[in-house]
Design a protein with these regions (language model features):
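Short, Lys/Arg-enriched N-terminal segments with co-localized hydrophobic residues
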Residues: 2-16
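A short aromatic-anchored loop/beta-hairpin motif
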Residues: 16-140, 145-201
Length: 201
């Protein structure tokens, strides 16, 4: 009975909580999961069934050019885009690529997440990344982060994450090593003020 009551309570909170799509989840310093230590996760989808997001500050030892080679997409190694680092977007389906990019007309395979951010898994879009047809700004992740129904809400109640509206400048313009600090600073306080008991925004 206790477990069912807990699940029902979490489900009710899911219905009451606004969608966190186009928000950042900022890992608290107390985060125990090594994958999400100091992680900034961009939430792409959040509804009553669960949530899906991409970590934007966990680089891996793979470049865009190397990734395109692995999936047999011709690319121009002389282009700066080919040298851009790929990120680990999460522990789920780590062989699957996701592209967050700035809006570009004609990208019918991309889904608009906000006025500044689109997402795609299309190989057609990947094939443009080292060409003149590429979006102005983009990042690629391998894998994604997923939460089942009520799981993210419970983690928020457990103070595992801070929440803030996403800023595309942090995704596309901020150096990787500064993204967590910059996201925290958007909340209006210093990193040193964070503690396991700080709660979520």
């Amino acid at each position: 009975m206790g477990l069912c009551h807990t699940q029902d309570s979490i489900t009710k909170r899911v219905k009451l909580m606004q969608s966190l799509e186009n928000h950042f989840l900022i890992a608290m310093p107390s985060m125990q999961d090594p994958f999400f230590k100091r992680a900034v996760t961009y939430i792409c989808e959040h509804n009553e069934e669960g949530a899906m997001g991409l970590v934007i500050n966990q680089p891996i030892d793979v470049t865009v050019g190397e990734l395109l080679d692995k999936i047999d997409i011709d690319n121009d190694k002389s282009q700066h885009a080919a040298q851009v680092t790929v990120f680990a977007g999460g522990p789920v389906k780590t062989d699957r690529g996701f592209v967050l990019h700035s809006p570009k007309p004609g990208y019918s395979a991309s889904q608009k997440l906000s006025s500044d951010i689109m997402i795609t898994t299309s190989k057609d879009v990947l094939a443009t990344l080292t060409t003149a047809k590429a979006p102005e700004q983009f990042i690629i992740t391998l894998g994604y982060s997923g939460w089942e129904q009520g799981q993210l809400e419970q983690e928020l109640l457990d103070n595992s994450w801070l929440i803030i509206k996403a800023d595309p400048k942090i995704i596309f313009d901020t150096p990787v090593e500064k993204r967590w600090e910059m996201a925290v600073s958007m909340l209006g306080f210093d990193i040193g003020q964070l503690s396991p008991e700080a709660g979520h925004a």
